[in-house]
From Swiss-Prot:
Its EC number is 2.7.7.8. CDD domains: KH-I_PNPase (cd02393), RNase_PH_PNPase_1 (cd11363), RNase_PH_PNPase_2 (cd11364). It is an enzyme of class 2 (transferase). This is Polyribonucleotide nucleotidyltransferase.
Length: 745
């Protein structure tokens, strides 16, 4: 019944198996990939006809994680898989990036690739298997796929590179890198790193590249037996068409590229585009040429003009040399109600970034195949249409926004303090208010500024830069800080973020058939110089975290209690902890190890909550001194309330060093006194003393009795309205206003 074809190889001490012919046989191509207990189904479906009027290659890639693959039922009200999670979107993009450039340029049939996780094994990297499966499916599909792609994951543990590390190993790794490519060149790199040098990063890329060659050989052998006939493709750029467009419009295109302003330049290029389509309208109607051929040929001619000027004259669109960085302007503290804010502007690209602190209750809960976990640091990248002057509605976050946000997250995450050093959850929102290339790297720079201004004790400032490539034969030029057109007409988008000490994130996408390691090495070194220049400009406005938090940030404190007391604080059905939160207006988080974190808007609210918690959880010890309130006065002494709900008795002889005839002459109901626990009677009632608690304490001074000091004075807190700006043009600090406020930690 089944005509199954299976190939396997030992890869990194595990069996990697790919097969076809058993599942999803009606799809143009369907491949099952297996490693360990992980099984993925990767399918490829290609439309038979091209849609009329289409002017691009409609490739859609979807990666899906089925809950049953990990023996789980989906959470939420509807117990089924819904919209794609962030991880599914990120892996979909990871598959897309090395594959898209390798289709024939003239191929515009709608193509859908779906990779579904059917069985999940945490010991194997399913994202890598998805790339391998998609490549294998394309290799046996009718789509004109020019090269076979494979991928590998690389970790760095104890100074040694590790191939395809497990999730557990990645927790201790200095590097989490995915590299994909063909047998001859690298196509895509994605990584998060803990301050790795450029040399070490290049070594890691080489290590990953060398180790996936085994998989490329496996897919080639598999495709020989299982492949189907490919679509026959025509020349995308008919020579007659290219000659005619060049003759009529090349001069106008060259003049348009001489305009430095993005808006004016784009307006001129759009006008030329309309002229070209109008000129060839009859040829389109007669089906001599199609829209895609005309638009692609126009793009190719435009690219040739731009690229030749860079390669031959070392001059870019905006007049910069290949290594020049656009002008930079920085400003912090411009949003007075935010906990931290910054505006980072580089040329015509601008990012407005805000930082907000929350409690552990505000952490993002993530439900994944590995299980449920929390993300303490959240970074949201927003790309509104107005940033590129487009009249479009605001929609839910796009795949691009999710991807750019995750890249910026990877750049910032390695330099954040741990939860012990900084107990807050952190949300960064980066809104791209202007865009002309490299907006994700502007997000990194703006996020670093906003975090430092907010007072987050990051390890070092971080900056990011996007590099480009123009390559013709053996001749190439690496471009620093690319703009939109250089990205669009160029051969590479290479983004590097890091501190002055090393790289924290790297992302590389190639638009040609691949590049060699010499180009990567040059790009990394040129990016390092650019990154240091950007950091220098950022440091002129703020070079280290503020020592104080914003007055708008929540106060917090943490105490440790006996684990056996947790149930007492929570109470039946959460009754006690709810009552504490309601009466104090504080948020309380209790960990299983007995760590209690209290968050509130000010110190007084925290104190109310802490007093109630201590009253329940803290057992007083003999010799301890407390603040107490006189509840009732008797002839023989007085009853004192201390630690919230605990009562004790002070005998008349323990009130003062001098003889007292009447207790009421010294103590009155409601008086605040210091008391010391000296023991318990035979019924377990606390015995207290006043005279030994504070011998120089004047009971007759009402101010002293009602103004008991806390054990520690509150520190200073910064006013968020403190504002600093830096503009590279005039090298002046424009304004600085400081207001102080007390807070409690």
């Amino acid at each position: 019944m089944f005509n199954e074809i299976t190939k396997s190889v030992i890869w990194n001490r595990q069996v990697l198996e790919i097969s076809t012919g058993k599942i999803a046989r009606q799809a143009d191509a369907a491949v099952t990939v297996k490693m360990g207990n992980s099984i993925l189904l990767c399918t490829c479906v290609v439309a038979n006809k091209v849609k009329d009027g289409i002017g691009f290659f409609p490739l859609t890639i979807n990666y899906r994680e089925m809950a049953y693959s990990a023996g789980k039922i989906p959470g939420g009200f509807l117990k089924r898989e819904g919209k794609a999670s962030d991880k599914e979107i990120l892996v979909s993009r990871l598959i897309d990036r090395p594959i898209r450039p390798l289709f024939h340029q003239a191929f515009i049939h709608e193509t859908h690739i779906t990779c579904s996780v059917l069985s999940y094994d945490p010991e194997t990297p399913v994202d890598i298997l998805a790339i391998i499966g998609a490549s294998a499916a394309l290799s046996i599909s009718p789509a004109p796929y020019l090269e076979i792609v494979a991928a590998s994951k690389v970790g760095l543990i104890n100074g040694e590179f590790v191939l395809n590390p497990t999730l557990e190993l990645l927790k201790t790794s200095q590097l989490d890198l995915v590299v994909a490519g063909t047998k001859d060149s690298v196509m895509m790199v994605e990584s998060e790193a803990h301050l790795l040098s450029e040399e070490k990063m290049l070594e890691a890329i080489k290590f990953g590249f060398e180790n996936f060659q085994t998989v490329i050989k496996l897919i080639k052998e598999f495709a020989k037996e299982a492949k189907k006939p490919k679509f026959e493709m025509q020349d995308l750029y008919p020579s007659s068409l290219k000659k005619e467009i060049g003759k009529l419009f090349a001069k106008e295109i060259e003049q348009a590229f001489a305009i430095k302003s993005k808006q004016e330049r784009n307006a001129n290029l759009a006008l030329i585009h309309e002229k070209v389509l109008t000129h060839f309208v009859c040829d389109i109607e007669n089906k001599k040429y199609n829209n895609y051929q005309i638009e692609s040929t126009l793009k190719a001619i435009s690219a040739d003009i731009l690229r030749n000027k860079i390669l031959e004259q070392n001059i870019r669109i905006d007049g910069r040399s290949t290594t020049d960085i656009r002008q930079i302007a920085c400003e912090v503290g411009l949003l007075p109600s935010a906990h931290g804010s910054a505006l980072f502007t580089r040329g015509e690209t601008q990012s407005l970034v805000s930082t907000t602190f929350g409690t552990s209750l505000d952490e993002q809960i993530v439900d994944s195949l590995e299980g449920e976990y929390k993300e303490r640091f959240m970074l949201n990248y927003i790309f509104p249409p107005y940033s590129v002057n487009e009249a479009m509605p605001m929609k839910a976050p796009s795949r691009r926004e999710v991807g750019h946000g995750k890249l910026a997250w990877r750049a910032i995450n390695p330099i954040l303090p741990n939860k012990v050093q900084f107990p807050y959850s952190i949300r960064v929102v980066a809104e791209t208010t202007e865009s002309n290339g490299s907006s994700s790297m502007a997000t990194v720079c703006g996020s670093s500024l906003a975090l430092m201004y907010a007072g987050v004790p990051i390890k070092a400032p971080v900056a990011g830069i996007a590099m480009g490539l123009i390559k013709e034969g053996d001749k190439f030029a690496i471009l620093s800080d690319i703009i939109g057109d250089e990205d669009y007409f160029g051969d590479m988008d290479f983004k590097v973020a890091g501190t002055s000490k090393g790289i924290t994130a790297l992302q590389m996408d190639i638009k040609i058939s691949g590049i060699d390691f010499k180009i990567i090495q040059v790009a990394l070194e040129q990016a390092r110089h650019g990154r240091l220049h950007i950091l220098e400009q950022m440091n002129k406005i703020i070079s280290k975290p503020n020592s104080e938090l914003s007055k708008n940030a929540p106060s917090s404190t943490t105490i440790k209690i006996d684990k056996d007391k947790i149930k007492d604080i929570i109470g039946p059905g959460g009754k006690i902890i709810k009552e504490i939160c309601e009466t104090s207006n504080a948020k309380i988080d209790i960990s299983d190890d007995g760590t209690v974190s209290v968050y509130a808007a000010d110190r007084d609210k925290i104190k109310v909550a802490l007093d109630k918690i201590k009253a329940i959880a803290v057992e007083p010890e003999i010799g301890e001194i407390f603040n107490g309130t006189v509840m009732k006065v008797l002839d023989s002494g007085a009853f004192i309330n201390y630690l919230g709900n605990k009562d004790g008795f002070v005998h008349i002889s323990e009130i003062s060093e001098t003889r007292i005839d009447k207790v009421s002459s010294v103590l009155k109901q409601g008086d605040i006194v210091k008391v010391k626990l000296i023991g318990f009677d035979n019924k377990g009632k606390a015995k207290l003393t006043i005279k030994n608690a504070c011998k120089d304490h004047s009971l007759n001074n009402p101010k002293q009795k009602n103004n008991v000091k806390e054990d520690s004075e509150p520190e200073q807190r910064r006013d968020a309205s403190k504002k600093r700006t830096w503009n590279e043009d005039n090298n002046t600090e424009m304004s600085e206003v400081i207001t102080e406020r007390k807070y409690f930690t």
